Amino acid sequence: WKLGNKKIAKIVKQKKTGKPYAVIQGVKKGKTTLLARYKHGKKIRKLTCRITVLAAKKATPQKNVAVPSSTASPSQAPNRAPAITLTPVPTATPTPTWVTTWGTAEEKCDVTSNAMPQIALEDSTVRQVIKVTTTGSKIRFRLSNQYGGRDVTIKSMHIAKQVKASNPEINTDTDATVTFEGKENFIIPKGKVIQTDAIDFPVEALENVAISTFFGETPTTNITGHRGARATTYQVSGNQVSANTFSNYKKTTSWFFLADASLLSANGSKAVVCFGDSITDGYGTDATYLGKKPDSYTRWGDYFAKRLKANKGTENVSVINEGIGSNSILGSYPTDAGKDRFNRDLLEHDGVAYCIILFGVNDLDKLQNTDKYNLLLPEYQKMIETCHKNNIKVYGAPILPFGTSSFYSENSEKVRQLINLWMRSSESGVDGIIDFENAVADPANPQNLLAKYTNKDDGIHPYNGYQVMANAIDLNLFQ
């Protein structure tokens, strides 16, 4: 024990029993703070305590005697050291921090496609649902009109908690107005991204939040959004942002203009970005032909978020899904190439501390030679370097097997194996490996997905194995 730099106590053993006890010396009556160092296994730990000296009686100078319990009175032990009470020193109140709790990869979408509503957004209310992955007290949104040919007019925007999945009903007791620079009616300029004001909105991790927006003018083509939401979006005519529920509504499974949502969360909250293609985007989780439905929240990232929340030490880590179906690292289909959107989808969020890269299968479609290896490698290296320059730990996920798919060729498989071999080596510079590959591969034919995880007409997407993938993640990497 020390008082400042002065050693005032020592641990000695009783002669008869061999049990240790503390001897306190030179402590005056009143309150003071002691610092202790002790061994816990092989580690040296520190403990700071506040002590209260109840009496100023001095110990017999010739002998070191044991400290009595805090219930002993000085009169009962006149020759003992003063009785003390040990209480922990109060810790400072943690400072909340902003962390992105939900996000999606923005892409250029056509309003006339099957993935989008068949009526214009103008003069309609669109209720979009997101699942937050952290707990917080305040919320704010980034709204994007990156690809739009004209401004987006927001006449009114409200948020509330969804009552149950696959239903437009909201809990009106939680209804709150979203503003931008204090205004309820605002513009998202063409080609721009804006951040709304922070508003009070207490919410728990894994709750569903409905964002209801009454639109004025909007682009009719090149809408900024995300096609594969895997969650239901509801649309009705007129201003119904605070309506308890909707009738005569249209449905889609896309998001519009929403880039991310951030929460003011507990100190130490962090985010992990999952960067990739349709496998990360959750292809198949809402496919009716596979017997699946929207709003199941069964992408591998969804299972990962649930595991993080249930695990002590990672409960304040959020998951941001930055996957886009059909996207590749090199090619700009159906939107910006992965290499071109990486910085945006990684660095524009709050509190990102980790990144998982599972990307590249769409670059390997029926290759006629192995030249793609030399084109892809520098792009992986740039992504890894970007993470490290921004103090973000990056975990590589080797490309999954696709031997039974239409993408397969001998050269495609050669490039896949070369990339995976490099990624697993120290040369890649990744901070760890997330081994989805071996989690879903067929042990007897490792160039294929295990048959039970995919469809015989697919062979690329392990939509029945997304939970297996999430279970393969070592949560210690995110402590």
What are the roles of these predicted feature ranges?
Residues 55-275, 280-288, 292:
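N-terminal secretory targeting modules
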Residues 275-277, 397, 434:
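Active-site flanking residues adjacent to catalytic metal/cofactor-binding acidic residues
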Residues 380-388:
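Surface-exposed amphipathic alpha-helices with a cationic face
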Residues 151, 157-163, 237-241, 245-254, ...:
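Conserved SGNH/GDSL esterase-like catalytic core that processes O-acyl groups on lipids
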Residues 365, 400-479:
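Catalytic His-Asp segment of secreted/periplasmic serine-dependent ester chemistry enzymes
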Residues 1-66, 70-72, 86:
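Extracytoplasmic soluble-region selector
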